[in-house]
Amino acid sequence: MRKWDKFFRILFFISILTIGYLSIIPAYKIPNIAALNFLSDKLLHALIFFNISILGLLSKYKLSKPMLLTLIFLFGLVIEIIHFYHPYRYFEFADLMANLSGIFLALFIYEKKIA
C-alpha cells in the first residue's frame, strides 16, 4: 500500500465516523444547521457524499468501484432510515437523491482523472 493510499483511507474513515456521528445527534445540537434552507441542505448532502466517495475511490480499496460506491450509498440510506425513527430528525427522499448526485459526481471526476 502506498503512503497516499493509507492517508486517504484514514481520511475516509474519519469522514465516515464524523458524518455518522453528526447524523445521529439531534439537529439542534449542530451549530447553524437550522439556518440551512432546502437547497443548501441538499447541496451539503451532495458535497458530503462527494467527499466520502472521492476519498473512498482514492483509497484504492480492493473492492470494485461499483461495490464501494454502493456501500457508501447504503451508508446514506441507513442514516435516512435512522432519521425516520429519530425524534429530532426526519427521513427525506431528496436527501438520498442529493447523496447519490455527490457519489456520481465523485465517480465522474475520478474517472476523468481530474481528482
Regions found by a protein language model. Name each.
Residues 17-20, 54-55, 77, 81, ...:
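Alpha-helical transmembrane segments of multipass membrane proteins
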Residues 45, 49, 91-110:
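Alpha-helical transmembrane segments that form the membrane-embedded catalytic/substrate-binding core
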Residues 6-7, 61-69, 92-93:
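Membrane-helix interface segments
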Residues 30-38, 79-100:
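Interfacial helix-loop-helix junctions of multi-pass membrane proteins
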Residues 25-26, 60-61, 87:
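Short helix-capping/hinge motifs at transmembrane helix termini and TM-loop junctions
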Residues 56-62, 108-114:
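Structural signal for the C-terminal ends of transmembrane alpha-helices
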Residues 1-54, 68, 72:
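"…centered on the first transmembrane helix and the immediately adjacent amphipathic helix/loop
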